[in-house]
Regions:
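Sec-dependent signal peptide recognition
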Residues: 2-8
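Asparagine-centered strand-capping/turn motif at beta-strand->loop junctions
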Residues: 27-34, 43
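Intrinsically disordered, low-complexity Pro/Gly/Ser/Thr-rich segments with frequent PxxP/GP/PP motifs
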Residues: 49-74
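A short tyrosine-centered beta-strand micro-motif
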Residues: 78-80
Length: 115
């Protein structure tokens, strides 16, 4: 007697999309002058750098004017550490990362870079 409603409930739940699947991707847009070879995010002010997001790209680098899908990051404010092909390492502080949106870093955003 309870088997049919239970079966219907199980099927309905398995077909319902998960919230994670509904989320639109976060993307980084490289507007610097050089190809980015490493990109890490840390919650703003914490220096707790996450994994290299360039691993998400087919060739593991983000050319000028290319976009990169960001994974395993929740929306919030982040410091972004990037390394480009010239060997320059830069940190851009307090970047707003929004679900389903693109955040960009331009050459003018880069200061205090080391190499």
């Amino acid at each position: 007697m309870y088997r049919v409603p239970l079966l219907i409930l199980i099927v309905a739940l398995s077909l319902a999309p998960s919230r994670a699947a509904d989320r639109k991707p976060i993307r980084f847009w490289n507007l610097t002058l050089h190809t980015v070879v490493s990109l890490q995010l840390s919650p703003a002010g914490q220096q707790a750098w996450g994994r290299d997001q360039c691993e998400n790209d087919r060739d593991h680098e983000v050319d000028h004017d290319e976009r990169l899908r960001i994974t395993d990051v929740v929306p919030g404010r982040y410091d972004i550490r990037l390394k480009d092909k010239t060997g320059r390492v830069c940190v851009v502080k307090n970047v707003d990362v929004t679900d389903g949106a693109v955040f960009s870093i331009e050459e003018k955003d880069l200061s205090g870079c080391g190499g």
